[in-house]
Amino acid sequence: MSFKDLGVSKWLLEALAAMKIRSPTSIQAECIPQILAGRDCIGGAKTGSGKTIAFAAPMMTKWSEDPFGIYGLVLTPTRELALQIAEQFLALGASMNIKVAVVVGGEDMVKQALEIQKSPHFIIATPGRLADHILNSGDDTVGGLKRIKFLVLDEADRLLSNSFGSDLERCFKILPDASKRQTLLFTATVTDAVRALKDKPVPEGKKPVFIHEIVSKDQVAIPATLTISYVFVPSYVKEAYLHNILVSPKYEKASAIVFVNRTYTAEILRRTLRKLDIRVASLHSEMPQSERTNSLHRFRAGAARVLIATDVASRGLDIPNVELVVNQDIPADPDDYIHRVGRTARAGKKGGSVSIVSEKDVERILAIENHINKKMDLLEEVNDDKIIKESLSIVTAAKRESVADMEKEGFGEKRKINKRKREERTRDSKKRK
């Protein structure tokens, strides 16, 4: 089957061919014709499945038949994923002079408002920043959203979690009713929130929702080419163990992502490893967007061998050739573990994952093993004597210096200031009402 067989526009066929995308993946072959037929869609979207084209191709095909106003809105949980999706839209639509606006945090709101006012064909946004514009930028700016034809929730399982609830509600209020638009959800796992949407009554005049390969929790699997292991350590020496793993003969040249749960931890580790002469970059929410983008570019290009990241890097991002994933902090949700380790062992390649487990993490590890139906192996490359001899003293000294530097610089103050500003804007908006 070809993209032509799926009903994609001729100009888009040429764009796909220019990008050397010639044959549709399973999710593309099944979803594209159904979306073109006017159906809402819930699609299973494993890493590397080609899900962006699965929704972008039919949206852009229908847009080219009636290119008027803001045609589609794509909501996604992270800034980096929004930028990546926008790049694909622009590449696909270059021959048609497509206009795409990226509306994410960390960028100038006034500049964004002016872009939205120009009615770009597609808006790619994070819910929080779009909600800010709806609340504060006025109907002249966001009024075009009332007439969109498509709404896409990418990484829908995460977007429909409690952390995005209030922002999504504000975004949905300005959009056309569900009966007057197509809604496309792409998700890696079926949460209760996604399942509830799947089972909702179909609005009058609409076709039944199309479902593609939804993976239930009891079918969760990790790649066969991925080795998963752990080390069990006291919490106060976790950084020393991390350093020893990264400089061990097995991993000293490996491209690695180290996942943590907090921005503060990410910054400490970045500074500590840099002092220990490891080429390192970081990615977390307290970094300015320009620095976040630069970190990703450096890691992709190999200028940084190690990326320290919170879960903003765990989903959807196209980062090829990651050989090792380290869980410096163990995630509370087993699905987050799956997304993290899914950054390696992609497309049949081999990859490794190491979880650094302390006494407080045991229940989380057991929950993960139960979820993936597989036991982790003990990592043999590190042992207590080796850590004490090679890493503990130098890592402790580097960490102490890093913490002192962060205190001098007032790390974390920007987040507090931004939080106060958001609270003030919300109060002002309520007063105006």
Curated annotation (Swiss-Prot):
Where can the motif Q motif be found?
A: 1-29
- Motif span (DEAD box)? 154-157
Q: Where in or outside the cell?
A: Nucleus, Nucleolus
SMART domains according to UniProt = DEXDc (SM00487), HELICc (SM00490)
Report the main location listed first in the record: nucleus
Catalytic activity line of the entry: ATP + H2O = ADP + phosphate + H(+)
Q: What class of enzyme is it?
A: hydrolase
Q: Name one GO cellular component term.
A: nucleolus
**EC number, UniProt record:** 3.6.4.13
CDD domains, per this entry? Answer: DEADc_DDX49, SF2_C_DEAD
Instruction: Give positions of region: Disordered.
Output: 401-433
Q: GO annotations under biological process?
A: endonucleolytic cleavage in 5'-ETS of tricistronic rRNA transcript (SSU-rRNA, 5.8S rRNA, LSU-rRNA); endonucleolytic cleavage in ITS1 to separate SSU-rRNA from 5.8S rRNA and LSU-rRNA from tricistronic rRNA transcript (SSU-rRNA, 5.8S rRNA, LSU-rRNA); endonucleolytic cleavage to generate mature 5'-end of SSU-rRNA from (SSU-rRNA, 5.8S rRNA, LSU-rRNA)
Composition bias type Basic and acidic residues, residue spans: 401-427
Q: Which residues take part in binding ATP?
A: A45, K46, T47, G48, S49, G50, K51, T52
Write one Gene Ontology MF term.
Answer: RNA helicase activity
Source species, domain of life: Eukaryota
* Domain annotation Helicase ATP-binding: ranges: 32-208
| InterPro entries with a match to the protein in the record | DEAD/DEAH_box_helicase_dom (IPR011545), DEAD_box_RNA_helicase (IPR050079), Helicase_ATP-bd (IPR014001), Helicase_C-like (IPR001650), P-loop_NTPase (IPR027417), RNA-helicase_DEAD-box_CS (IPR000629), RNA_helicase_DEAD_Q_motif (IPR014014)
Where would I find the Helicase C-terminal domain in this sequence?
247-387
Q: Which family does it belong to?
A: Belongs to the DEAD box helicase family. DDX49/DBP8 subfamily.
Q: What is this protein's function per UniProt?
A: ATP-binding RNA helicase involved in 40S ribosomal subunit biogenesis and is required for the normal formation of 18S rRNAs through pre-rRNA processing at A0, A1 and A2 sites. Required for vegetative growth.
* Domain text: The Q motif is unique to and characteristic of the DEAD box family of RNA helicases and controls ATP binding and hydrolysis.
What name is this protein filed under? ATP-dependent RNA helicase DBP8
- This chain's source organism reads Meyerozyma guilliermondii (strain ATCC 6260 / CBS 566 / DSM 6381 / JCM 1539 / NBRC 10279 / NRRL Y-324)
Taxon lineage: Eukaryota, Fungi, Dikarya, Ascomycota, Saccharomycotina
